[in-house]
Regions:
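N-terminal pre-catalytic segment of deacetylase/amide-hydrolase enzymes
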Residues: 2-96, 241-256
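Short phosphate-binding/catalytic loops that engage adenosine nucleotides
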Residues: 73, 120, 210
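Extracellular/periplasmic catalytic domains that process cell-envelope and extracellular macromolecules
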Residues: 28-31, 89-92, 117, 148-151, ...
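Short beta-strand and adjacent tight-turn residues that come in two discontinuous sequence segments
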Residues: 125, 213-215
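Noncatalytic alpha-helical scaffolds and linker/capping helices
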Residues: 101-102
Length: 256
């Protein structure tokens, strides 16, 4: 009897939880905010032994895309997001923006095919120095050009030429870096390395014809993007390997 009472209680609580999530989902469907999902590496679980939470299992990534598809989410392009952000056009109901940082080759090897399977758009923020390095870890220029042909749903934008480990980000340093990157990749969108920026950084990007820049991480307002955000300080939501599907869902529907 005790066991059956516990089971009934669990069922009641589960029903209440699902009902509450449903209400939240309906309320947030048309809100003027967009969840920008931030990924890095994608690897099949059988070879994902790094212990780094930024390396997401490919199977987990696919489950997240399945959920987006099931809930009717539209994955925006950068131009769609920019158009909405500037108040020039309306976004589709339940819109998200999927991003990847650093330009890992495993994005090409695993993530792109999964995105294509579910007919979803995404953007990869590439590091110029890695593009020219021809390593096995990051996509080089040749791989990126190949990806553009094979996966027209994938966009490529700037993650700096080589500012990840530059502690002193003065106007001159950022300006020179941006000019170097512009020779490799034609884009007007940018993601700050580690989400770090200052006003000199922002000015240098503006002077190099970047229209929008994205931040990252809890210290950089870990929340959805909204219309009031500065175009050069757009927040993103980090997606990690230890994140449950429920937590992922909450990232999508909570009004924050």
């Amino acid at each position: 009897m005790k066991k059956s009472s516990k089971l009934i209680l669990i069922l009641i609580l589960s029903t209440i939880l699902l009902f509450c999530l449903g209400i939240l989902y309906l309320e947030c469907a048309n809100e003027d905010k967009v969840a920008i999902l931030g990924y890095h590496s994608i690897l099949p679980s059988k070879i994902n032994d790094s212990g780094d939470n930024l390396v997401v299992d490919a199977e987990k990534f696919e489950k997240e895309l399945k959920l987006l598809k099931k809930l009717g989410y539209h994955t925006m392009t950068l131009d769609e997001f920019y158009c909405w952000k500037n108040g020039e056009c309306k976004k589709k109901e339940n819109s998200v923006l999927i991003t990847f940082d650093d330009g890992y080759k495993n994005n090409y090897d695993y993530a792109f095919e999964i995105l294509k399977k579910y007919d979803m758009n995404a953007v990869v923020f590439c590091v110029g120095a890695y593009m020219e390095a021809n390593s096995d870890i990051h996509m080089n220029i040749e791989t990126i050009e190949k990806a553009k042909e094979e996966y027209p749903n994938i966009e490529f934008a700037s993650h700096s030429y080589n500012l990840h480990f530059h502690s002193d980000k003065t106007y001159e340093i950022v300006d020179n870096d941006a000019k170097k990157m512009n020779k490799l990749l034609e884009t007007s969108y940018y993601a700050y390395p580690f989400g770090d920026y200052n006003e000199d950084y922002v000015k240098a990007l503006k002077d190099n014809d970047y229209d929008m820049a994205f931040t990252f991480g809890p210290s950089k307002e870990h929340r959805k993007a909204d219309l009031s955000d500065n175009n050069y300080k757009v927040p993103r939501l980090n997606i990690s390997n230890d994140m449950s599907i429920i937590k992922f869902l909450l990232r999508l529907i909570l009004p924050m």
